[in-house]
Amino acid sequence: MPELPEVETTRQGIAPHCEGQTIQRVIVRNPSLRWPVPADLAEHLEGKTIRAVERRAKYLFLHLETGSVIVHLGMSGSLRVITDDSPAMTHDHVELVLGNHRRLRFNDPRRFGCWLWTTDWNRHPLISALGPEPLSEDFNGAWLFRLSRQKQTPVKSFIMDNHVVVGVGNIYANEALFKAGIHPKRKAGRISLDRYHKLAEAIRETLSAAILMGGTTLRDFVNSDGKPGYFAQSLLVYGKAGAPCTECNTPLKEIRMNNRSTVYCPRCQR
């Protein structure tokens, strides 16, 4: 599933081609996504100019003068900017024809993504209750410490909660906890402020590095020009169960938490 770095990579890729462009035509080949594509989407978009392409958590927004399109990539979705004469591919469900002879195409084999229309994106039910962005000034160790008091939740589950902080998916939670030296099953309420400062910094460092490398491609994700991300080559623990820890050479262990793979060093992470 595309996580925050993959979605941010997509935003950076499509924004230069979309911002300031007029949407000449909307093509919906298959409206049956996670939620049905609005039947009147073309009425809202055609003839309108894309003022900005922004990201909030794992959602992308195409902001127009009258409202915004909310796009989620789901499990396997991607947005690509292509030349005007490129034929449509299988699973190209939604397409915007732009005034610069480019097309923005949404491809989603599993159809868990979405295209929605809203006139007030900040108050949309999908957005309004989200926690802070992990790369923003609002997110720090003090924030994690304050929200974690009395929490019996494992810290890995805690930082993956979008009400606490957005965009820390399974891969990046594994990596950040390793860098911070914190065991993924340690109770969130039993972690000190100092250790939360280290964890917040590890989350920022991990996500920033992943964005610079175009995200992590393990199966489905490709960016806006159809190329994979390369952060998988820099992973320290995720997918490396049994390999020696890069810090102490102890074999890394794998457990399941909430039915997700969790890899950690039993010596370095406490």
From Swiss-Prot:
Signal peptide: none annotated. Coiled coil: none annotated. InterPro entries: DNA_glyclase/AP_lyase_DNA-bd (IPR015886), DNA_glyclase_Znf_dom_DNA_BS (IPR015887), Formamido-pyr_DNA_Glyclase (IPR020629), FPG_cat (IPR012319), MutM-like_N-ter (IPR035937), Ribosomal_uS13-like_H2TH (IPR010979), Znf_DNA_glyclase/AP_lyase (IPR000214), Znf_FPG/IleRS (IPR010663). GO terms for biological process: base-excision repair. It comes from the Bacteria. DNA binds at H91, R110, K151. The active site is at P2, E3, K58, R260. It catalyses: Hydrolysis of DNA containing ring-opened 7-methylguanine residues, releasing 2,6-diamino-4-hydroxy-5-(N-methyl)formamidopyrimidine; 2'-deoxyribonucleotide-(2'-deoxyribose 5'-phosphate)-2'-deoxyribonucleotide-DNA = a 3'-end 2'-deoxyribonucleotide-(2,3-dehydro-2,3-deoxyribose 5'-phosphate)-DNA + a 5'-end 5'-phospho-2'-deoxyribonucleoside-DNA + H(+). Its EC number is 3.2.2.23, 4.2.99.18. Its cofactor is Zn(2+). GO terms for molecular function: 8-oxo-7,8-dihydroguanine DNA N-glycosylase activity; class I DNA-(apurinic or apyrimidinic site) endonuclease activity; damaged DNA binding; zinc ion binding. The keyword Cell membrane does not apply. This is Formamidopyrimidine-DNA glycosylase. It comes from Marinobacter nauticus (strain ATCC 700491 / DSM 11845 / VT8) (Marinobacter aquaeolei). The lineage of its organism: Bacteria, Pseudomonadati, Pseudomonadota, Gammaproteobacteria, Pseudomonadales. The gene is mutM.
